[in-house]
Amino acid sequence: MAQVPRVLTFRDFGLKEDPFPFLKGQPITFQGIGCKEPFAFSCYNPGEKILGKPMYKHLPMAMAYWHTMRGLLADMFGPGTAVRPWEGQDTMENAENRLRVAFYFMWMQGIEFWCFHDTDIVPYGKDLKEFHANIDRIVPLILELQKLTGIRCGWVTQNLFSHPMYCKGAATGTHPIVWAHAFAQTRKMLEVGKKIGALNHVFWGGREGYNELLLLLLGLEQRNLAKFLQMAVQYKKQIGATVQFLIEPKPKEPTVSQYDMCMMVVYGFLRRWGLASHFKGNIEVNHAQLVDLPVEHELTVAADLGMLGGIDGNQGTFGNGWDTDDFLADPMIALRIMIVVLKNGGLGRGVINWDAKPRRESFMPEDLFRTHTAGMDTLAYGLRAAALLQQEGKLEAAIAERYAPWLSNLGRGIAEGSMAPDAICEAAYAHEPKLGTDIPSSHIESHRYLLVSAMQRCCMGVKSTHIEPTWRLAN
């Protein structure tokens, strides 16, 4: 018996009117390669199997609540331009209505996961107590909407950078009372994450760094940050939470230099303080670009360390030098991302979070769908091409050939430590390696072209029938 997709209307979400009338009640679906309809996928077909697994399982997409629902497209030169009919007064009533709109958006867009900061979902109120009371009030609605839709929480986090008290940092700040507030927010979100079934819990140290070295006690700040994370680990264990802890590296902005600069720096810090086994990395494309690294570098480091825990799917504006959070629109970047993800066996319980926003000129509600649809299609192109490369095996064969000399007696002797230093040096004296005979060309350009070729061929023969993901099917 064929499984039937569930049909939900805006009324099922408790909304009085449709916030997205331009969709005419029709969710975004796959309509075939080359489709030019702005509210349809031309490459992302969620239920289609790639390498034996549905596409939506390879690409666990998540909506970023802060950009999608709260972002008004303001910048340092002017106020927001975004037209968001659901944005009203900063009240609990409006917060609840906004949440209903958010879940309706995800349902219509076909996004299975969502991610949020504590300050995204409710007003702060007059103090921390009121803030946390507001969170307690909205949690039942979160559970109700998750049950209605099958949408799950990819990760929760705490905003420890926006409140004025965090101007000098949170866990690395100069005042213990600020540290205490930061930990109270973190503890609360650990509790919330457990209640709503969050898969992960992200730590991003937006102001955990410095702006002036002249005034810095580096050792004190590093110890305080380590203690903060250690206490989070302890509290997670105390309450029996199962979330995976993730740290999101970023080199700068808003501080001059942040302590979670890149994945290798994060690993060194975690290992120094005995925390490496408790955390993985949430790698953002734009953040990697800010440290002048391609995102596949950061992904490869994380994967090699066994610490690839999630991805923020966006990209920067080349040459700008700041975190512009554009939607991913370059299929070749997507391809390099997916090569690493497939080689890693996926993201485990991690998600690909659309930490991205429309441009200031793209201010209408429909632009939220246009941008997410384009980003999801871009990743799908990357997945299809990466899968084709994996099936053909040419890159794997080239890598095996490249490092084959390490399978020789000399290579094994060095790697295993079984060859004495004198014997190693005698081997060096006995043979002078020559380019072309002992050391072959790597043919790098030809291997780069394999990616172009795969992107050209990956959609040949793809059928145009939409296949629903199981999470959207009727019981």
Where are the regions that the model predicts?
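Flexible, acidic glycine-rich loops studded with aromatic residues
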Residues: 306, 320-473
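Active-site acidic/histidine proton-transfer and metal-coordination neighborhood
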Residues: 2-16, 22, 47-50, 97-101, ...
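N-terminal basic, low-complexity leaders that serve as flexible interaction/assembly modules and, when applicable
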Residues: 2-85
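Conserved, mostly hydrophobic/aromatic
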Residues: 63, 106, 182, 193, ...
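Catalytic domains of carbohydrate-active enzymes, especially glycoside hydrolases
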Residues: 53-61, 90-120
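Active-site beta-loop-alpha junctions enriched in small/polar residues
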Residues: 66-68, 119-121, 158-161, 206-208, ...
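Gly/Pro-rich active-site loop or hairpin
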Residues: 73-97, 216-222, 256-268, 279-280, ...
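N-terminal small/glycine-rich loop or linker at the start of catalytic domains
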Residues: 57-89, 157-173, 205-212
